[in-house]
Curated annotation (Swiss-Prot):
<keyword id="KW-0276">Fatty acid metabolism</keyword>
<dbReference type="GO" id="GO:0000038">
    <property type="term" value="P:very long-chain fatty acid metabolic process"/>
</dbReference>
<comment type="pathway">
    <text>Lipid metabolism; fatty acid metabolism.</text>
</comment>
<dbReference type="GO" id="GO:0005782">
    <property type="term" value="C:peroxisomal matrix"/>
</dbReference>
<dbReference type="Pfam" id="PF08840">
    <property type="entry name" value="BAAT_C"/>
</dbReference>
<dbReference type="GO" id="GO:0005829">
    <property type="term" value="C:cytosol"/>
</dbReference>
<feature type="active site" description="Charge relay system">
    <location>
        <position position="388"/>
    </location>
</feature>
<protein>
    <recommendedName>
        <fullName>Acyl-coenzyme A thioesterase 2, mitochondrial</fullName>
        <ecNumber>3.1.2.2</ecNumber>
    </recommendedName>
</protein>
<dbReference type="InterPro" id="IPR016662">
    <property type="entry name" value="Acyl-CoA_thioEstase_long-chain"/>
</dbReference>
<keyword id="KW-0443">Lipid metabolism</keyword>
<comment type="function">
    <text>Catalyzes the hydrolysis of acyl-CoAs into free fatty acids and coenzyme A (CoASH), regulating their respective intracellular levels. Displays higher activity toward long chain acyl CoAs (C14-C20). The enzyme is involved in enhancing the hepatic fatty acid oxidation in mitochondria.</text>
</comment>
<dbReference type="InterPro" id="IPR042490">
    <property type="entry name" value="Thio_Ohase/BAAT_N"/>
</dbReference>
<dbReference type="GO" id="GO:0005759">
    <property type="term" value="C:mitochondrial matrix"/>
</dbReference>
<comment type="similarity">
    <text>Belongs to the C/M/P thioester hydrolase family.</text>
</comment>
<feature type="active site" description="Charge relay system">
    <location>
        <position position="422"/>
    </location>
</feature>
<keyword id="KW-0719">Serine esterase</keyword>
<dbReference type="InterPro" id="IPR029058">
    <property type="entry name" value="AB_hydrolase_fold"/>
</dbReference>
Length: 483
């Protein structure tokens, strides 16, 4: 029997440690938690097809611990990466640690404790974490469980032209302060998929960035908007362009020469942006899609209600009432829904919980803030975090559905995610528990539990792509929710 490890998977990256470790024979049963056969796992890990002699499994006497990633080296942010370690002692306890610094230098970290199998190998797709930042079988846990070193920091990607680098380390032992470093590697996750074209948009009053797939067009067009933080965020649009859509990330305040506040917004600006997208030679009509989260989701509802040429809209934790400022369109005005700051609660950590602050748009003068969704001719998908503490997203989605159906409109699709907070991002972004709210002027909690929120993000990302392909043209079909 050969004592040499086979060469690693051709599409994997292997970094060898300078540290050596002796391994010894072991008499152990195979774990029932394995999802794969030993044979298929060995093919990924590059381990030999060891022959069992009686109850003794012979392993090499000395070998270097190595980290294996697939895809190798780098991949798109929304893609999973397979992580494995080989060259450990049988049943060796180890701690895996992931570290990432954002563009401002803020540190995010996660760690988990594991135990190698009888061959001294560890595959995160079949080995459960025994504790740490998470527990259980979570192959991508080291990413979605990342937490900021300092509180109130949300992971945001400002420049999609550069990747974020994740440092992965394998350390000996399970102690609170793990032992010596066994091996490490650097994994880059990019936001601009290969071949995707990035075109800044400065046409008339419109300020944004258009992302086009690498293939020949025309493509279904989507306008993408974020919330009250203002500025221009491109990372969702750039990732979505890699799925076959022409996506324009649209700024609407606090960016370049746009208004510095959103006290007054005019839908004519959004109409101009939509018309620009529809007139682009690589965008196919007859209508466009809208994608928005928070205030951006609310604006999707307003655009679909007042403007023509909108075929489909995805609203992520949006309000059915106009919030934060007055909205104008051709002589019509929507006032903002009222607020009562006396309804702010304070958490044990001293952060504000504002979920009850907004008045109901169903009562009294606040009824005038209700967006007239019954005018909309588009079809809707509402993605809802049931633990959203920014506002009552599930209530708003249900009220929009009632209003649409009462006026004979198509019933929207509503997908609700338990234990999911406000910021439903593309897959593998870590949960932001609390951060500064631009309108409130103080830190607030956003809601959500890390694992449930992470699973919701993976599902929501698939759902919105399927929805847009179905209603804007392209691949038809629906995906049953896994959450």
């Amino acid at each position: 029997m050969s004592n040499k490890l086979l060469s690693p998977h051709p599409h994997s990256v292997v970094l060898r440690s300078e540290f050596k470790m002796a391994s010894s024979p072991a008499v152990l049963r195979a774990s029932r938690l394995y999802q794969w056969s030993l044979k298929s796992s060995a093919q990924f890990l590059g381990s030999p097809q060891l022959r069992q002699v009686g109850q003794i499994i012979r392993v090499p006497a000395r070998m270097a611990a190595t980290l294996i990633l697939e895809p190798a080296g780098r991949c798109c942010w929304d893609e999973p990466v397979r992580i494995a370690v080989r060259g450990l002692a049988p049943e060796q306890p180890v701690t895996l640690r992931a570290s990432l610094r954002d563009e401002k230098g803020a540190l995010f970290q996660a760690h988990a404790r594991y135990r190698a199998d009888t061959l001294g190998e560890l595959d995160l797709e079949r080995a459960p974490a025994l504790g740490g930042s998470f527990a259980g079988l979570e192959p991508m846990g080291l990413l979605w469980a990342l937490e900021p070193e300092k509180p109130l920091v949300r992971l945001v990607k400002r420049d999609v032209r550069t990747p974020l680098a994740v440092e992965l380390e394998v350390l000996d032992g399970h102690d609170p302060d793990p032992g010596r470093l066994l091996c490490q590697t650097r994994h880059e996750r990019y936001f601009l998929p290969p071949g995707v074209r990035r075109e800044p948009v400065r046409v008339g009053r419109v300020r944004g960035t258009l992302f086009l797939p690498p293939e020949p067009g025309p493509f279904p067009g989507i306008v993408d908007m974020f919330g009250t933080g203002g500025g221009l965020l491109e990372y969702r649009a750039s990732l979505l362009a890699g799925k076959g859509f022409a996506v324009m990330a649209l700024a609407y305040y606090n960016y370049e020469d746009l208004p510095k506040t959103m006290e007054t917004l005019h839908l004519e600006y959004f109409e101009e942006a939509m018309n620009y997208l529809l007139s682009h030679p690589e965008v196919k009509g007859p209508g466009v899609g809208l994608l928005g989260i928070s205030k951006g989701g609310e604006l999707c509802l307003s655009m679909a209600s007042f403007l023509k040429g909108i075929t489909a809209a995805v609203v992520i934790n949006g309000s059915v009432a106009n919030v934060g400022g007055t909205l104008h369109y051709k002589g019509e005005t929507l006032p903002p829904v009222g607020v009562n700051r006396n309804r702010i609660k304070v958490t044990k950590d001293g952060y504000a919980d504002i979920v009850d602050v907004l008045n109901s748009p169903l009562e009294g003068p606040d009824q005038k803030s209700f967006i007239p969704v019954e005018r909309a001719e588009s079809t809707f998908l509402f993605l809802v975090g049931q633990d959203d503490h920014n506002w009552k997203s599930e209530f708003y989605a249900n009220e929009a559905c009632k209003r649409l159906q009462a006026h004979g409109r198509r019933k929207p699709q509503i997908i609700c995610y338990p234990e999911t907070g406000h910021y439903i991002e593309p897959p593998y972004f870590p949960l932001c528990r609390a951060s500064l709210h631009a309108l409130v002027g103080s830190p607030i909690i956003w809601g959500g539990e890390p694992r449930a929120h992470a699973m919701a993000q993976v599902d929501a990302w698939k759902q919105l792509q399927t929805f847009f392909h179905k209603h804007l043209g392209g691949h038809e079909g629906t995906i049953p929710s896994k959450v």
